[in-house]
Every structure is written in structure tokens, then in C-alpha cells.
Amino acid sequence: MIGKKVLDEIYEINIAMELIVLGARMQVLESETSVSRRRLVRLYKEIRGCPPPKGMLPFSEDWFMCWEQNIHSSLFYNIYLCLQKTENERPITTLMQAYRLYLEQCYPHSSETPVLGLTRAWTLLRFIGCGMISRKSCMLCAGGFVMVTEFIKEPFTCSLCCPPSRALKKFSATSGSS
């Protein structure tokens, strides 16, 4: 029986290590693993070389509704849903797999900072779980996008089908510099 407990602890520490490497904040680590806070802080310092950042997690569904953040959040959530249907894993494991796939698709050869960090991806799943955010299909392209639940009954056009002018400016600026 003790062997099982040691293996469980190793499994939890491995999850914590993967989460730290992917950029998780302490609140995510404490919520998703059974490792003590003291050990998590030590692990964080060993892996990152600095103490974990202090402060509260972002708490606003509005962040996920801005055009660029919405596209990235929706892409991540669609990957997550696909993995959730095909894999029989713990939700945190599915989150990590989906986040890695998101990074592969959006940043294959780049060292840029991702639009959607792991902590925000985790927060998105929590918002969806408590009903603050839902998924809806675009009426033009039929792609699945995240949106605030209170507007779910209204017709919806995604920012890929109808990009805001600032998105077009950003795209022309980045394509002109390449």
C-alpha cells in the first residue's frame, strides 16, 4: 500500500513539474495537485530559477472576448474538447495536452510569448465549467468560438469572418515586416 502512495506522490510531482514548465501560476498548481505549497515553491524555484510570481489570478471573462484573445481561446478550447472526447484522462492532463497542441499550432518555430498562457487557459476552463462562458458557432463559418453566456442567444459572427479594423492593421503591419 505504501508503494502506491509513493507512486501517487511521484505522479503529482510530475504533473506539477509539467505545469511549471508550461507557465502555470501557484494557484493552478495548488488547485490541481496534492503537493504541499512549500514543496511547490521549492519545485518552482528549481525549475524556473526564481520564486513564483505573487498576486491574484486574472478574473474577467472580458479578456477572452477581445478579437485576438477570443481566436486563441477558442482554438485552445476546441482542441481541449476534441481531446476530452478521445482521451480518458484526468482533466488537468487533458488541459496540458491541449495547451501543448495549441502552442505547436500557433508558435511552431517561435519563441514569442503566446497570447493565451496556461493559467488563462485553465481559467477559461473554470469559467466554462461554472457557466460564465459558453461555446457558440459562427453563423458564417460554423467554427466554434467562446463567448459570454449572457449573449449566447444572439446571432454571432466571429472575428475571423468579420475582423475589427485594428486586426487588419495588425495583420498588414506584421506581413509588411516579413
Swiss-Prot record:
Q: Which organism is it from?
A: Erwinia tasmaniensis (strain DSM 17950 / CFBP 7177 / CIP 109463 / NCPPB 4357 / Et1/99)
Which InterPro entries does the record match to this protein?
Answer: FlhC
Q: Which gene encodes it?
A: flhC
Q: What does this protein do?
A: Functions in complex with FlhD as a master transcriptional regulator that regulates transcription of several flagellar and non-flagellar operons by binding to their promoter region. Activates expression of class 2 flagellar genes, including fliA, which is a flagellum-specific sigma factor that turns on the class 3 genes. Also regulates genes whose products function in a variety of physiological pathways.
> What's the record's note on cofactor binding?
Binds 1 zinc ion per subunit.
Where it sits in the cell: the answer is:
Cytoplasm
Q: Name one GO cellular component term.
A: cytoplasm
Binding-site residues, Zn(2+): 138, 141, 158, 161
Q: Which GO terms describe its biological process?
A: bacterial-type flagellum organization; positive regulation of DNA-templated transcription; regulation of bacterial-type flagellum assembly
Task: Specify the protein name.
Answer: Flagellar transcriptional regulator FlhC
Q: Which Pfam families match?
A: FlhC
Q: Name one GO molecular function term.
A: zinc ion binding
Report keywords, A-Z. Answer: Activator, Bacterial flagellum biogenesis, Cytoplasm, DNA-binding, Metal-binding, Transcription, Transcription regulation, Zinc
Assembly and oligomerization: Heterohexamer composed of two FlhC and four FlhD subunits. Each FlhC binds a FlhD dimer, forming a heterotrimer, and a hexamer assembles by dimerization of two heterotrimers.
Requisite cofactors = Zn(2+)
- List the transmembrane segments: none
Family per UniProt?
A: Belongs to the FlhC family.
Q: Does the keyword Phosphoprotein apply?
A: no
